[in-house]
Amino acid sequence: MLKLEQVKKQYKNFTLDCSLEVRPGCITGLIGQNGAGKSTTFKAALGLIHTDGGTIEMLGKPERELKESDRQQLGVVLSDAGFSEYLQVKDVIAVMKSMYPNFEKDCFISRCEQFQIPLDKKIKEFSTGMKAKLKVLLALSHDAKFLIMDVK
């Protein structure tokens, strides 16, 4: 599912040098102090930042060769990313339907009800916990084959 070999990223006061493998069916957690490189590792794996060396494979392909259809198989939660907080969940549903052919609208709405996430309230009015729940529900809403979750 995910393989990083000697992935390097150099910042002014930090150097990431990471190798790891996540096999199908496995749950793997990265645990470390603030600034240890957990978020950097996730962003590198997703191709969101340029790395300074090493190789990254996801879903059996080099990360750079992933197509849109491959990326639609990923469910991603990043602590510093999400939808505009001026949107309502019902607006997010429309976006998800247009981006993910496998988006399961009815299941998503049912889960929102189960976890008390209102569809007609702006995200900026949500508590921190409600925002976190929404991100996870969105990551699970389109039958993703691989989940990457970077939460605080």
Regions found by a protein language model. Give the residues of each.
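Helix-to-loop junction immediately C-terminal to a conserved catalytic motif
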Residues: L46
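Conserved ABC transporter NBD signature motif
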Residues: G54-E65, S69-D70
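ABC nucleotide-binding domain signature
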Residues: G29, Q72-S79
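The feature captures the beta-strand-to-loop junction immediately N-terminal to the Walker
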Residues: I31-Q33
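ABC-family P-loop ATPase nucleotide-binding domains
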Residues: L78-K135
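A short, flexible loop at the N-terminus of ABC-type nucleotide-binding domains that lies
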Residues: M1-S19, P24-C26, K67
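Catalytic Walker B motif of ABC-type/P-loop ATPase nucleotide-binding domains
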Residues: L147-V151
